[in-house]
Amino acid sequence: MMQPKRMKFRKMFKGRNRGLSKGTEVSFGEFGLKAVGRGRITARQIEAARRAMTRHVKRQGKIWIRVFPDKPITGKPLEVRQGKGKGNVEYYVAQTQPGKVLYEMEGVPEKLAREAFALAAAKLPLATTFVTRKVM
């Protein structure tokens, strides 16, 4: 699973997932999986989608992961009263806005890429769409 190697601060404020996204173009591969909705993707979901794609294309071509889970999410154990400080870090998430390209792929036929991205999209908690690279 992906997580930061080291952070200046271990815990983070909740914050708000607003604004527009950077990384809206397919820049590395031929095909991409773009987020249509806004949300949080956990490191486990990113890895599960990557595995589904890799297995479907039988390790052909190349896959790029364009999101990184750098936001720590904390939680308190069950049946613990409130107060006594912020909970421990449970997992890491990547916050995504509409238009963000999540994965890219090249070296496989378009039909196979569409099928692989459909499998990956089933593992993700937000709506996605298939995009191709714009050639000038």
Curated annotation (Swiss-Prot):
InterPro entries referenced in this protein's UniProt entry, alphabetically: Ribosomal_uL16 (IPR047873), Ribosomal_uL16_bact-type (IPR000114), Ribosomal_uL16_CS (IPR020798), Ribosomal_uL16_dom (IPR016180), Ribosomal_uL16_sf (IPR036920)
rRNA-binding listed as a keyword: yes
GO cellular component: cytosolic large ribosomal subunit
Pfam family, one: Ribosomal_L16
Gene Ontology MF terms in the entry: rRNA binding; structural constituent of ribosome; tRNA binding
Key words of the record: Ribonucleoprotein, Ribosomal protein, RNA-binding, rRNA-binding, tRNA-binding
Biological-process GO terms, alphabetical: translation
Subunit structure, interactors included: Part of the 50S ribosomal subunit.
Similarity annotation: Belongs to the universal ribosomal protein uL16 family.
HAMAP family, A to Z: Ribosomal_uL16
Function field: Binds 23S rRNA and is also seen to make contacts with the A and possibly P site tRNAs.
Protein name: Large ribosomal subunit protein uL16
Organism: Psychromonas ingrahamii (strain DSM 17664 / CCUG 51855 / 37)
